[in-house]
Amino acid sequence: MTVLEAQRKSLNLAALRDPSRPVSRIADDLLPYLQVLVDEFAPRQVILFGSYAYGNPDEHSDVDLLIVKDIIQSAYEDAVAIRMRWAPLMKRGRLFSFDLLIEPPEEHEARLRGGAFYREINERGVSLA
């Protein structure tokens, strides 16, 4: 087993399909996107936050994801790479609007210590991977 394989996360399907959480309503449609994210981009952690995690989503709600991963180029370029890889899924599956926050582990730890927004994500969000 390589180091990358050892670090690779698997999806938390129980959390994704938990009927007490709003995300369960879109779980089957969201799963292909999350599988690509986990399999191809090796995040250390993926946390769903916002209305699909702990709110009251409607047809205009986006899917908010905090992705903790080693940054390959920049957070922006990594987000573009993820979205480009998701493009074929959007053509044949359900179209989602995603809000991606991507940060390296060190930055994430610092933000948890210093910001209420990130603490709320960590405490109330749904850990998907």
Residue ranges of predicted features:
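Glycine-rich beta-strand-to-loop/alpha-helix junction loops that act as flexible
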Residues: F49-S51
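Catalytic core of pol beta-like nucleotidyltransferases
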Residues: M1-Q45, Y54-E59, K69-A129
